[in-house]
């Protein structure tokens, strides 16, 4: 303590440390220094009892606290950091990714340079602890606080869909040297880092699709509750809030519909995300919007999914509305197939409704209408589709067998998911990570699902199509920090060497030795699903391929393909119409990343949309080199 800036700039970690410091080293001047000097002369017990005053200006001594929480962290916009919880650890985590402050061990000597950023710890230290008591857990259990301090802005993209990036609110200003240290190192916490050798549960992405109001978000919320990811108290709070808005049957969906607009209207807009685990697998729920205005968002969700759950309302009138021409049941099932989803679980929901009352006749009626359509889309009724009745609101047949439907002999929903065979994913394939979103948080963070290959911390990668060289600074797999990830995992990767503004959704992270293909012109095979008039060369639409959305023009029609025999016509067609299959040449407005369907199916399937409707689905056959 050689600076004369007064000891309000810093505080001893404990009373033992005060005893160790010589009386002469205390700064002279105000009442603060006299209080410290007085404390040094007194026995511990009397000093403690005399000084226990929550209104005291210098500090409130607390013998159980190993460290102090900086007072500037109490602002509402700042995420919580670790308070005195990690107890006996005598390490000072400096520059290890704690953007909001440093932890100090109980017996560690305090250097003056490290003390100064701990601005005025004020007497209301107990108040600080109280304010931070919710997000901070007991000693050693630091996962939640660590997660939030590493990436507070991810809350907007996932937990609060629809918001802008909150990364700009940023951490408080620190010295240049500390900022550099924190950028170069990611947190090293034993409680969060998963060792690369540890056995991992298989990651499975499940997208919930179906017509608006079928009950997708409610089922998602019920799963979160039944698997312990949302506690009873939180649900009771949602129920109270929903009742106040006369929306009491919507409260379960609020676990996934987190923004105010979605709650007020009862409609999912963004793709909500949540996680749950079974004995064998780790699942990510992608709750896709059902309204036709938000189909592009639904396509983004389906492109990341391994498995689709088509939610159908059994309520009289609702099933028919969702399934007829204008409904989203048909379009969603078709888009899920186009996005590469192999398995489809059809949940016939709202079986508890008075118009249905767990009627097997109604269940079979819905099933009979759906099977021919799903077969036409490309799902095999025997291998790819599984039907089950349920009630999202009551939770019947979600986790446990329901007494209301003794006629259903299969497994309930969650046990069925747990017993699915493993998805065979190659860890040796080329690295392909399509970017879904990006934001700033102590650098550039990108979000996406690793389609193939494996990524480790410190690895050098290339961002395509711009060929930016980047370095992996840190990896979060479903909000858990790790050093190594395998295909199928949902990742947040912090990158060095690229700015957030230089990345767009649809860009791909690749291995420098095995880059993905990129271009603007390519030949495709397309099936015209729905279009009233004929389609000729020069027709413009919107292309959805993996996570990329781009304007596209059909520049040429090459041949028609016979649906039954697969034979191609000898002459070039002048136009194509609904239900026809053709080979065509497409040209995008900008350069995009893509692969042929034969080489890499996940990046070779696409959808064409126009005027809010899916007009065609297709696959990439060949990339055409650009003419100089």
From Swiss-Prot:
Residues 349-352 are annotated as: G4. The keyword Metal-binding does not apply. Residues 1-49, 72-124, 146-195 are annotated as: Disordered. GO terms for cellular component: cytosol; translation release factor complex. Changing residue 52 to K: Impairs interaction with UPF1 and PABPC1. Residues 391-393 are annotated as: G5. Coiled coil: none annotated. Residues 266-270 are annotated as: G2. Residues 287-290 are annotated as: G3. GTPase component of the eRF1-eRF3-GTP ternary complex, a ternary complex that mediates translation termination in response to the termination codons UAA, UAG and UGA. GSPT2/ERF3B mediates ETF1/ERF1 delivery to stop codons: The eRF1-eRF3-GTP complex binds to a stop codon in the ribosomal A-site. GTP hydrolysis by GSPT2/ERF3B induces a conformational change that leads to its dissociation, permitting ETF1/ERF1 to accommodate fully in the A-site. Belongs to the TRAFAC class translation factor GTPase superfamily. Classic translation factor GTPase family. ERF3 subfamily. This is Eukaryotic peptide chain release factor GTP-binding subunit ERF3B. It comes from Homo sapiens (Human). The gene is GSPT2.
């Amino acid at each position: 303590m050689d600076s004369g800036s007064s000891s309000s700039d810093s505080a001893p970690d404990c009373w033992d440390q005060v005893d160790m410091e010589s009386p002469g080293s205390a700064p002279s001047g105000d009442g603060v220094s006299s209080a410290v000097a007085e404390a040094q002369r007194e026995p511990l017990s009397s000093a403690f009892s005399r000084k226990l005053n929550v209104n005291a200006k210098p500090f409130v001594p607390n013998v159980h606290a190993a460290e102090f929480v900086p007072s500037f962290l109490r602002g509402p916009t700042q995420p919580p950091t670790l308070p005195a919880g990690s107890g006996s650890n005598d390490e000072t985590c400096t520059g290890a990714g704690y953007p909001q402050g440093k932890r100090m061990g109980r017996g560690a000597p305090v250097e003056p340079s490290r003390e100064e950023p701990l601005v005025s710890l004020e007497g209301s230290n107990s108040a600080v602890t109280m304010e931070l008591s919710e997000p901070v857990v007991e000693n050693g259990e630091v996962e939640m606080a660590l997660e939030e301090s590493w990436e507070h802005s991810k809350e907007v993209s996932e937990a609060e869909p629809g918001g802008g990036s909150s990364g700009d609110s940023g951490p408080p200003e620190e010295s240049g040297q500390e900022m550099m240290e924190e950028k170069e190192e990611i947190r090293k916490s034993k409680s969060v880092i998963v060792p690369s050798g540890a056995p991992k549960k298989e990651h499975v992405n499940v997208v919930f699709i179906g017509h608006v109001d079928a009950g997708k978000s409610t089922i998602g919320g019920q799963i979160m509750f039944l698997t312990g990811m949302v506690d009873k108290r939180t649900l009771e709070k949602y129920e109270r809030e929903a009742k106040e808005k006369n929306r009491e049957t919507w409260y379960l969906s609020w676990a996934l519909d987190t923004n105010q607009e979605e709650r007020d209207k009862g409609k999912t807009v963004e793709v909500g995300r949540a996680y749950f685990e079974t004995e064998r697998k780790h699942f990510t729920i992608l709750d896709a919007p059902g309204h036709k205005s938000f189909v592009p968002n639904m396509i983004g969700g389906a492109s990341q999914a391994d498995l689709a759950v088509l939610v159908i309302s059994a309520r009289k009138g609702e099933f028919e509305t969702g399934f007829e021409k204008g409904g989203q049941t048909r379009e969603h099932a078709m888009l899920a197939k186009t996005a590469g989803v192999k398995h489809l679980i059809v949940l016939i929901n709202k079986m508890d409704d008075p118009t249905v009352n767990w009627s097997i006749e109604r269940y079979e009626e819905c099933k009979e209408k759906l099977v021919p359509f799903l077969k036409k889309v490309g799902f095999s009724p025997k291998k790819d589709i599984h039907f089950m009745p349920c009630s999202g609101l009551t939770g019947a047949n979600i986790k446990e067998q329901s007494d209301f439907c003794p006629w259903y002999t299969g497994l309930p929903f969650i046990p069925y998911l747990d017993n699915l065979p493993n998805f065979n994913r190659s860890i040796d394939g080329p690295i392909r990570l399509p970017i879904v979103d990006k934001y700033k948080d102590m650098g550039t963070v990108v979000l996406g699902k690793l389609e193939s290959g494996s990524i480790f911390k410190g690895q050098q990668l290339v961002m395509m199509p711009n060929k930016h060289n980047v370095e992996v600074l840190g990896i979060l797999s479903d909000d858990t920090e790790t050093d190594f990830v395998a295909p199928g995992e949902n990742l947040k990767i912090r990158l060095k060497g690229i700015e957030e503004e230089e990345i767009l959704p649809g860009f791909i992270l690749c291995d420098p030795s095995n880059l993905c293909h990129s271009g603007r012109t390519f030949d495709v095979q397309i099936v015209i699903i729905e279009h009233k008039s004929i389609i000729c060369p020069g027709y413009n639409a919107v292309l959805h391929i993996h996570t990329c959305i781009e304007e596209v023009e059909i520049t040429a029609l090459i041949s028609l393909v016979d649906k039954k025999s697969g034979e191609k016509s000898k002459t070039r067609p002048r136009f194509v119409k609904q239900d026809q299959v053709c080979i065509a040449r497409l040209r995008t407005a900008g350069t995009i990343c893509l692969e042929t369907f034969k080489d890499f199916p996940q990046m070779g399937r696409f959808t064409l949309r126009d005027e809010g409707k899916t007009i065609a689905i297709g696959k990439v056959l060949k990339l055409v080199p650009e003419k100089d």
